[in-house]
Amino acid sequence: MSLRGEIKLNSFDLMGVRIDPLTMDETVQTVEKFVLDQRPLHLMGVNADKINQCQTDESIKKIVNDSEIINADGASVVLAARYLGYSVPERVAGIDLMQELLHLANEKGYSVYFFGAKEEVLNDMLTIFKKDYPSLRVVGHRNGYFSAEEEEAIQEDIREKNPDFVFVGITSPKKEYLIQKFMDNGVNSVFMGVGGSFDVLSGHIKRAPLWMQHAHLEWLFRVANEPRRLFKRYFVGNATFIKRVLDEKRKSKK
């Protein structure tokens, strides 16, 4: 279900991927419309890695472009879009958006379901949330380690509990495929893939200091803390992304 014709998003195409240049506040307001109307929503955030994936995987590209809202999550996407002449008001980082939606749910009484990460991480995050969001209605939670045979049971648990928000903290592209599957099977919630945000919000992994976030260097902090897992993704992946951006710029000048 697209927002076209309902809300003017001024979307643009970045290397075959639709970007909706919304601010954080506009995103939260738009998401709440879906909650109030009880309509399903796949809330997508794209960074350089996701755009790189879309260049080589048509199935993930379709899931991304079919999402109702697509935010510019990564700083590299914001900078690349502006370099190519598109207007992007700000970066809407997934972890920040998740926290804004939790504040909304805490204030308005919307229900939430957390799916992902290790059991210890999940429990520590929920303990913190009891203090930070005392009125938050957590109707269910489930760790992110499961077999293919367990997917249907997870889907039915979410369907039965009927949360307004489902935050999915598992790796990409697995989370995108799973969210799409649940939505195709009629689970009527706002789904947001949040990657490793549970690890950060539980205190198990530190987030970059604000000055690094503002300087668009959060990726460097993450690589320094998890070099084995993230070196290839950021250094090789970012180099590939930059080359593609430069190629796009050259094409636009012809």
Which ranges hold each PLM region?
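Conserved beta-alpha
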Residues: 81-157, 161
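A short helix->loop->beta-strand "cap" motif at the edges of active sites that frequently abuts
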Residues: 40, 110, 187-189
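Proline-aspartate-enriched helix->loop->beta-strand connector
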Residues: 158-167, 172
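A transmembrane-helix-recognition feature enriched in membrane-embedded lipid enzymes
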Residues: 78-81, 208-254
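N-terminal nucleotide/polyanion-binding subdomain common to many enzyme families
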Residues: 2-90, 95
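Short glycine-rich anion-binding loops that position phosphate/pyrophosphate groups of nucleotides
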Residues: 47-51, 170-175, 197-198
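Short, flexible loop segments at boundaries between secondary-structure elements
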Residues: 143-149, 187-225
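Short Gly/Thr/Asp-enriched flexible loops that form oxyanion-binding sites at enzyme active sites
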Residues: 126, 176-185
